[in-house]
Amino acid sequence: MANDLFVKDALFNQASPSQVAPRLLFIPVSGTYGMGEYARSLAIARAASRRWQHAAIHFVLSREAPYATGAPYPATLLPSSPTFHSVAVIELIEKWRPDVVIFDNAGRTAQMRAALRSGARVVYISARRRQRRKAFRWHWMRLIDEHWIAYPEFIAGSLSLSERLKLGLAGRPEVRYLDVILSRVLPGQREAILSRAGCDAGTFVLVVPGGGTGHPGADHAVEQFMSAARALAASGVPTVYVGPVNATSAAGTAKDSGPGAHSIDAATLNWHPLGPVPQADLAELMRSARLIIANGGSTLLQAVACGSACIAVPIAKDQGERTRRCVAAGVAVAAARDSASMVQAADRLLQDETQRVALAGRAARLGLADGVEVALQSLARLLKTARHAAPP
């Protein structure tokens, strides 16, 4: 029956088993805080499962990560980030025999060598300068088939002279910029998403602090974002909040019950907390927002890729430089990590339509690539040259 299915699709007529039912192993750095690497790997995994319906996908995660137990794919859970558990990672690679192993800001030399010995192709994703430097070490360049730089070139920087010389001499790996990981909903779902938000397109401010896992030195960042969102709502601005919502804030959103329900104030009418939402839904909200207040991480670049006017608020150590580059490119304005600064920046843009529209226009003209599609095309090329057929 499986062979009959393959024949029905002309694309797979000459395909090897690994091209039709690839085994993809994702190893993102993971731990008690931050989830950018996991979110990126998950978006690629979901897209891969749609492209290759028979794909086998497996994750390796820290059991301390707040998202670990809710992962939608089979996962091997380790005491901490996979980088620190080479014995377990190597054992999994040797037993499971993936076609491609994707290390996202994680991995050790021994783990990559094990992947090569098993016949797998190796992808390394770097999201920080330190990891990028590691990927350009001579012994890693011989192990990596593709090096994906997680951010756009204007953020991550062009290849240096040294990097270009090394690539010329080594002849590998292939280097690609992922630009932005931006999931998409199915056609026709936009109206349903806006209906759940309770706002029309182009009318609301979207406030997104990020994944909600606390970065060192960023204590109370979520509370500051939420406070800013509530203040904007109280001033009469329709405000959609996507992120962690505590019980106190949720209780303050009640729109009915009680003798005073008929006199709902502006803050309640304009306050639309959604809690966490799927990435694809968030992207649709970004495309529909009048203005976005976001952290300085991947969320900021997603907002820019959606062609939206954006206020960037760095909440982690590595987000400051990213924010500065976006400001320098004229695609975002910056605000400090306190609610008053966020509200002040939002008020200025909401009252200056010319500046807001110009900001959004420059963001749209960047034309950032869809990193998920870049990743899928690269995986398809790697699978064509897989050095072994996936086991049954």
Q: Can you say where each PLM-predicted feature lies in the sequence?
A:
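Acidic donor-binding loop of glycosyltransferase active sites
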Residues: 287-294
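Active-site and donor-binding regions of nucleotide-sugar-utilizing enzymes
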Residues: 27-51, 59-168
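Catalytic binding pocket for nucleotide-activated donors in carbohydrate/polymer assembly enzymes
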Residues: 300-344
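A nucleotide-sugar donor-handling region in carbohydrate enzymes
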Residues: 143-211, 244
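Catalytic donor nucleotide-activated moiety binding site of glycosyltransferases and closely related
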Residues: 62-72, 233-276
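C-terminal alpha-helical cap of glycosyltransferases
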Residues: 368-392
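Conserved catalytic-core segment of nucleotide-activated headgroup transferases in glycan assembly
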Residues: 40, 44, 186, 196, ...
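A short, well-ordered alpha-helix in the C-terminal region of glycosyltransferases
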Residues: 355-369
